[in-house]
Amino acid sequence: MENPNNQTTYLVVDGENIDATLGLSVLDRRPNPEERPRWDRVLESAHGRWGQKAKGLFFLNGSSGFLPMGFVQALTAMDYSVIPLSGPAEMKVVDVGLQRTMDAIADLGKGDVILASHDADFRPQIETLLDQGRRVAVMCFKEFLSSQLHELEERGLEIIDLEYDVHAFQVRLPRLHIIDIDDFDPMSFL
């Protein structure tokens, strides 16, 4: 069997989906700079998850002809491969790019995947990878993850919370979450 340290964890990031969920669902407004994910922590978490080298693939929609170059340069400095895609207005180019990439990883016959998204559009690719015996995780805000992806936990899909598991934020986000009674501290509510 191949040494797991020779394997690669592909961190496949749906940048639009993470940003939209953070702004529209978690904060209900545009995030302040300190409320955005620390993408270096996200990549470090991917590396540490299964003890393998991690390759970050960050997908952006470039259909408008504009890219946030400061952000792109920062991602590149953190060793992400930034993949700006464009296409017709009616096409979800980032989703198509992510699907094709996950299909290509399946065709490689090796490598594990952490998908940063909440979107059920990737269920077929996740199922294929799970069927091949790959380790697959979704990195997200758990409460906003598609129920179609939650259903795959019993097949081996791991769910990783961006805030609670990865600690990707510098500030605590205003999220309502279920608290295990053993972790409940009434003083934090007083």
PLM regions: where:
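Domain-level signal for Mg2+-assisted phosphodiester chemistry and nucleotide/NA-binding surfaces
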Residues: M1-K92, R135
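Nuclease catalytic cores that cleave nucleic-acid phosphodiester bonds
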Residues: S64-L190
